């Protein structure tokens, strides 16, 4: 069973889905069909979760799916920590119609949100928060940030 909450903001509306086993049962087709997708996965997220997501996305006929696994900590939540994400997007010629997916906790959702907001002046983003704090804070509300010190 899942619940959907529609969030309305001045810059645009979005949907928050809440439930268990959504990755394996959600119909992603309207979001991913014929699109390039980059999943940025926190290294602490079990590979089984990534595979469930990858299978579900593949059933929705994307153009391609790439995965980048990153180490997350307050040190990597920086400009330098973002470089590998930008490099994968650029090396694979991801365009403005691509989709970025953040799979992990609050640091991951902050980093991926920052990249989505700045790559090619903004690309589509799906956040899949995997910790309680990221589910109630970091992945919701449209805020994102990195450390600069």
Give the positions of each predicted feature.
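A glycine/threonine-rich phosphate-anchoring loop and its flanking beta-alpha core
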Residues: 8, 17, 23, 114-149
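ATP/NTP phosphate-donor binding region
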Residues: 1-99
């Amino acid at each position: 069973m899942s619940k959907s909450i529609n969030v309305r903001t001045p810059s645009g509306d979005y949907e928050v889905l809440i439930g268990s086993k959504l990755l394996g049962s959600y119909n992603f087709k309207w979001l991913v069909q014929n699109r390039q997708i980059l999943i940025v996965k926190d290294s602490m997220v079990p590979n089984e979760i990534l595979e469930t997501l990858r299978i579900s996305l593949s059933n929705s006929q994307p153009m391609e799916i790439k995965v980048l696994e990153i180490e997350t900590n307050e040190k990597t939540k920086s400009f330098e920590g973002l470089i590998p994400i930008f490099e994968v997007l650029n090396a694979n010629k991801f365009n403005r119609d691509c989709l970025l997916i953040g799979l992990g906790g609050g640091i991951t959702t902050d980093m991926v949100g920052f990249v989505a907001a700045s790559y090619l002046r903004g690309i589509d983003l799906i956040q899949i928060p995997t910790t309680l704090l990221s589910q109630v804070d970091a992945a919701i509300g449209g805020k994102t940030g990195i450390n600069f010190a």
